[in-house]
């Protein structure tokens, strides 16, 4: 046998051995008492709160929670790299079709409710806007704060990135006013930021900025605006009670997605999320529990 053939056989043997080791590792990892939860940046603090409490009660379990956006979480579920996707929007038809092609059956679980707060700096005199005014501002048709009762100052638009469920929801429900044929887009000059916290930090330091995110991120460094459906409607502040009673016009459900009906540790974790203890964590993180 030539030296070249011996080297080829050695390479093939090593390749087979490597594949066996990878398969064995994957099988062993699957049997571990751990799950990966990924997705909505709005929900990441909530998800970590659930995970920490669950692991405190179940020391042998490991729940890893990361953000990245609703689209990122759903893509990970579809590709099989996470067990639970967190999403602040419904899964899209094209995502379901792609999942089905890959043998994934997305199962939707409503885990809480959220109000989208529209925030400005506390130094900004504007305290209320209509949904229509918001649409005009974020699409770039209203450019100066003086047009809505504020200072003579150019508006600085802050938005989440396009893979964010918060971005998608705001565009569909505020810019396009729930019109399935709507074509309105965010103004080209809008700054697309990677997280809700990034928007919160920017608003806190910029008196001309306006942004939006889940109301759980609001602090004393930002001022949430009261929002009205139209000029004839009451202006409503983004509070838990106003989301729960349906008065606040920019509210939405928060979802978990699993591959088929939850099983094993995934089911135990989801059951915990939906329990009174899990829903108390929803309330403690300034979201609205589904069973309140």
Task: Please name every model-derived segment.
Residues 27-292:
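Exported/periplasmic ABC-transporter solute-binding proteins
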């Amino acid at each position: 046998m030539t030296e070249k053939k011996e080297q080829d056989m050695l390479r093939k043997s090593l390749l087979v051995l490597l594949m066996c080791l990878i398969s064995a590792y994957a099988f062993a990892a699957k049997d571990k008492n751990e799950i990966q939860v990924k997705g909505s940046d709005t929900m990441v603090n909530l998800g970590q709160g659930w995970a920490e409490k669950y692991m405190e009660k179940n020391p042998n379990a490991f729940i890893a929670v990361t953000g990245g956006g609703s689209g990122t979480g759903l893509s990970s579920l579809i590709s099989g790299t996470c067990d639970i996707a967190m999403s602040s929007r419904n899964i899209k038809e094209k995502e379901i079709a792609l999942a089905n092609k890959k043998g994934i059956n997305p199962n939707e679980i409503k885990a809480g409710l959220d109000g989208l707060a529209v925030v400005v700096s506390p130094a900004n005199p504007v305290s209320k806007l209509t949904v229509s005014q918001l649409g005009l501002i974020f699409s770039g048709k209203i450019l100066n704060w003086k047009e809505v009762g504020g200072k003579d100052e150019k508006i600085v638009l802050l938005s989440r990135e396009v893979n964010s469920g918060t971005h998608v929801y705001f565009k569909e429900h505020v810019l396009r006013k729930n019109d399935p044929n709507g074509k309105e887009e965010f103004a080209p000059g809008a700054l697309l930021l990677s997280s809700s916290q990034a928007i919160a930090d920017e608003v806190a330091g910029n008196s001309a900025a306006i942004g939006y995110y889940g109301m759980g991120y609001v602090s004393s460094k930002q001022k949430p605006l009261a929002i009205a459906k139209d000029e004839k409607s009451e202006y409503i502040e983004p509070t838990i009670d106003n989301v729960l009673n349906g008065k606040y016009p920019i509210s939405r459900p928060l979802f978990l997605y699993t591959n088929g009906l939850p099983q094993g540790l995934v089911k135990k974790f989801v059951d915990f999320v939906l329990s009174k203890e899990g829903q108390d964590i929803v309330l403690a993180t300034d979201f609205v529990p589904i069973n309140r």
